[in-house]
Amino acid sequence: MSTATRPSSSATTSVILENPVSQSQPTERLVLRLNRKKKKVSWKDGTVDNEFMQKKSSKKCCIFHKQKPFDEDDSEEEDDNNHHCDHNHEHSESGEASSSNDSKAVD
């Protein structure tokens, strides 16, 4: 007895469904914004200016210090950097005043 084997045939059917892209849908955009804490200045108790005028004082000098470009030579005006400022602070090279006893705190 002989047996005959038939090759198995299989059929594959692929169905592709396409959804038409609708042009009527609007594009949604979300914009996220960071809620920053508001800056608030608070003064230590007993902080009064040096003229005893009962005003709160800051560590900034009352005299404007003009910023100079980095490449500008100021060797001729070196004495002007310490211009008659009799306040209780030192001036940095950037022209800002710094005090050894800071009298304000920023939150």
Curated annotation (Swiss-Prot):
Keywords attached to this entry: Protein phosphatase inhibitor
GO cellular component terms given for this protein: protein phosphatase type 1 complex
Consequence of changing W43A: Loss of binding to protein-phosphatase 1 (PP1)
Knocked-out gene: effects: Embryonic lethality due to embryo development arrest at globular stage.
InterPro entries: PPI_Ypi1 (IPR011107)
Source superkingdom: Eukaryota
Low complexity: bias regions: 1-14, 95-107
UniProt GO MF annotations: protein serine/threonine phosphatase inhibitor activity
Chain intervals with Basic and acidic residues compositional bias: 81-94
Region of interest (Disordered), residue spans: 1-40, 69-107
UniProt key word Heme: no
Coiled-coil ranges from the UniProt annotation: none
GO biological process: embryo development ending in seed dormancy
Bias-annotated ranges (Acidic residues): 71-80
Organs and tissues of expression: Expressed in roots, cotyledons, leaves, flowers and embryos.
Oligomer status and interactors: Interacts with protein phosphatase 1.
UniProt function note: Inhibitor of protein-phosphatase 1 (PP1). Binds to and inhibits PP1 activity. Required for early embryogenesis progression.
Name of the protein in its database record: Protein phosphatase 1 regulatory subunit INH3
Organism: Arabidopsis thaliana (Mouse-ear cress)
Source taxonomy: Eukaryota, Viridiplantae, Streptophyta, Embryophyta, Tracheophyta
Designated gene of the protein: INH3
